[in-house]
Design a protein with these regions (language model features):
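Hydrophobic transmembrane alpha-helices and their immediate loop junctions
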Residues: 1-503
Length: 503
């Protein structure tokens, strides 16, 4: 109940903040805000009624989701219609053409910042229709246009874009080398005042975008540091509560028994800290600054993990992949090690007893348990070492963060391998699947709501957003996604029967 109330309050606060930001942009801003509100509405209604003890059946949930989807599509069409009308007016004017928001393959609803992450997006035009202006000073623009050449990138058109400019043209060399050469020339002429991005537009053609350095990712503010600290304290408390529930008592009603729940908290922190160390080590290797981790407390398993944003621009998609995968790899290896040690150390009389049917809840865990414990899984109750529980929950936390959605580690991995378009599609598919699974699992409902509210948008493009990671990284990414699926997917009754899992 407390978690539900907190989620509702956070969602309402985000909606109010988004509405305030949208007002200065008129109808375009309001329509973009309404799209976000429509996406959140079914979940807010579901959580609100749930908190009041009213449960919506399957038919009601489907009606809410279908209605929300229909409204979202309608608002998107209205938003595109307004954008096309503005673009047509601009084309007929004597001033330069204003770049549409879709130039970088970024949809209109991504123009707002959701959660603690900044990104490169097109803001609604601030000039009057038909009178677009170039935000870059004329002298600087002339210097920027001078960096292009027939040996790197042959510029054909310059278009105003937010606080910078888009330079359409033809790529004449390898993307990585060209981006490095153009960036070096830009620094030689204008110092560190501008950033050069090489991205694909909607037509899959290389496009150069130059933005002022003032649009770099913002550093963590003192208020955000305080929030990170508050969330860390809350995670300590929920970790203790989850450990208490696991042992059959309520920490709030039996506060003096908190030492009994402490081992669970320690196991949880080992997983979370190893995850963050993985991110930090690779980020340090590439010279990328990270924000402090914003831990996500939950009563069910102690924590969902953490949200960490980039405070530096990323050189290319290889860097995005390495930093994104390093956290789950470190946390997953630690969790898997604890699970295997726990299974090996399990014996009759171990501290915890689990119904053997529990091991049917995960393809990976159930299979490993069968290999190690053998016929013990045919008994109604299975004695297990505490490390088994810690490792299993650590794998669940890692798998949840590897879901291919938005700014989750899995979403970043997919974006790095396949690009923004595919990552956007996998985000929608993930949310739909979570919505269906949540009908029988409240944990999936909470996670879906958090993704929808805080993490649904993609990462901002890399400086070189065209060069793809190598095949080895692509294979590692697919393996990680497969293992995450194996952790979260339950065994079918027939397969569990063939494996001899369940009394």
């Amino acid at each position: 109940m407390v978690t539900t109330g907190l989620i509702l309050l956070v969602a309402i606060a985000i909606l109010a903040w988004g509405y305030r930001r949208a007002l200065p942009y008129g109808s375009v801003g309001i329509l973009a805000w309404l799209q976000s509100a429509v996406l959140m509405a079914p979940w807010l209604l579901f959580f609100g009624l749930f908190a009041l003890g009213i449960y919506i059946n399957l038919a009601g949930v489907l009606v809410l989701l279908l209605g929300s989807t229909g409204l979202y599509i309608y608002l998107g069409r209205r938003l595109r219609a307004i954008g096309q009308a503005t673009l047509a007016t601009s084309k007929n004017a004597t001033a330069p053409e204003t770049a549409p928001e879709s130039e970088l393959g970024i949809s209109a609803d991504e123009s707002e910042v959701s959660g603690p992450t900044d990104r490169v997006t097109a803001a609604p035009p601030t000039a009057a229709p038909g009178q677009p202006t170039m935000a870059i000073p004329t002298e600087d623009l002339a210097q920027i246009e001078g960096i292009f050449g027939i040996d790197t990138y042959f510029r054909t058109e310059t278009i105003p874009y937010d606080q910078g400019a888009i330079f359409r043209g033809n790529l004449r060399g390898q993307p990585a080398e060209t981006q490095a050469q153009l960036s070096a020339r830009l620094r030689d002429r204008l110092g560190d005042r501008y950033r050069l991005f090489l991205v694909e537009n909607q037509e899959k053609k290389p496009t150069v975008v130059v933005l002022p350095a003032t649009m770099d990712p913002a550093k963590t503010t003192p208020a955000q540091w305080v929030l990170a600290l508050v969330l860390a304290v809350a995670t300590f408390l929920t970790g203790l509560e989850a450990g208490a529930i696991l042992q059959g008592f309520d920490l709030i009603q039996a506060l003096s028994r908190w030492p009994a729940a402490l081992p669970f908290l320690v196991g949880l922190l080992v997983v979370l800290i190893s995850h963050e160390i993985g991110h930090w080590v690779l980020a340090r290797r590439y010279g990328v600054r990270l924000s402090p981790p914003f831990l996500i407390p939950t009563w069910q398993i102690g924590s969902f993990g953490s949200l960490t944003r980039f405070e530096s621009l990323l050189a290319d998609r290889r860097v995005l992949f390495d930093i994104a995968l390093a956290g789950p790899a470190a946390g997953g290896l630690v969790s898997l090690t604890m699970l295997l040690l726990g299974l090996v150390l399990s014996h009759p009389g171990s501290l915890f007893q689990l119904p053997s049917s529990f091991f049917q809840g995960s393809v990976l865990v159930g299979t490993l348990a069968k290999v190690v414990l053998g016929k013990a899984l045919q008994e109604p109750l299975v004695d297990v070492h505490p490390l088994t529980i810690f490792g299993w929950l650590g794998l669940v936390i890692t798998a949840l963060n590897l879901m291919p959605a938005g700014q989750l580690d899995g979403g970043r991995v997919v974006q790095a391998i396949y690009g923004r378009k595919v990552a956007g599609r996998t985000t929608v598919i993930t949310l739909i699947l979570l919505a269906l699974v949540s009908l029988g699992n409240p944990l999936a409902l909470y996670w879906a709501a958090l993704i929808l509210i805080l993490q649904r948008n993609l990462e901002r493009p890399c400086l070189d957003d065209i060069t793809e990671p190598d095949d080895a990284r692509a294979a590692l990414g697919l393996l990680a996604l497969f293992l995450a699926l194996a952790v979260l997917m339950p065994l079918t009754p027939s397969l569990a029967g063939r494996l001899g899992i369940g009394g």
